[in-house]
Amino acid sequence: MFEGFERRLVDVGDVTINCVVGGSGPALLLLHGFPQNLHMWARVAPLLANEYTVVCADLRGYGGSSKPVGAPDHANYSFRAMASDQRELMRTLGFERFHLVGHDRGGRTGHRMALDHPDSVLSLAVLDIIPTYVMFEEVDRFVARAYWHWYFLQQPAPYPEKVIGADPDTFYEGCLFGWGATGADGFDPEQLEEYRKQWRDPAAIHGSCCDYRAGGTIDFELDHGDLGRQVQCPALVFSGSAGLMHSLFEMQVVWAPRLANMRFASLPGGHFFVDRFPDDTARILREFLSDARSGIHQTERRES
């Protein structure tokens, strides 16, 4: 996987971020979600690398990145901390400004980065998510049943870690295959093996739990403080039409107050449509990124 890409471990302060870098052109950061890692992009990144310098990175707590012990206030696993990690990664690699595509937790990290560091994010694509604040504020019995793991994973340590650790494959495969609206056949075997390596690591189990603990505490508070703020860069809301998120929320309506310059796209499949439809995913991302770049250039010409 990732033939022609360079594997890097980059020190960004208190953690080290694992990434792969390949291609040439404007910088593009691809971020994964739960319960995956950077290998979710293995069949998409090469399709973008002829036009972009593509960086696929593991979030802290996932894959080959550092997995610190969670702090009592959960701040070291907040999306603010994760966004800071990834921004510093890109700056260390030589990119002050870049396009950002994030799936699931990576999309939440991207949304936070676009709020905290708007000068760094040229365009933002959020894949199959709604804002963290809305996920907690608009809970009904259907949302609670579909997203039960949000509440289980944020329980105090070490309870969820021990439950998951007793049989990690059953837990995580239940998430992956259930939300994906498909079985194991919908995933590349090499990618699945990389996910399983992560699932079986107790430090990664702890990291993902800490991620969700932050979601229900500090991330919610930060998002509440930013109600009314809009991301100004070009933005794409991209979902799987057979997924739970798409069926439970009017995604365009939910995102419209938060993204000033938004478009919407969807593909068949569930939450993990990137794995199932890499060619179509890359095509839609290329179209969005091309239009975003054209709009940025037009704005820069008007301002010069």
Curated annotation (Swiss-Prot):
- Which top EC class is named for this enzyme in its record? hydrolase
Segment forming the signal sequence: none
Q: Where does fluoroacetate bind?
A: R105, R108, H149, W150, Y212
Q: What result is annotated for mutating D104A?
A: Abolishes enzyme activity
What results from changing H149A? Abolishes enzyme activity
Residues annotated as catalytic: D104, H271
Q: What is this protein called?
A: Fluoroacetate dehalogenase
Which taxonomic lineage does the organism of this UniProt entry have?
A: Bacteria, Pseudomonadati, Pseudomonadota, Betaproteobacteria, Burkholderiales
Q: Which reaction does it catalyse?
A: a haloacetate + H2O = a halide anion + glycolate + H(+); fluoroacetate + H2O = fluoride + glycolate + H(+)
Question: What are the residue positions of the site described as Important for enzyme activity?
Answer: D128
Q: Could you tell me which species this protein originates from?
A: Burkholderia sp
Query: How does its activity hinge on pH?
Result: Optimum pH is 8.5-9.5.
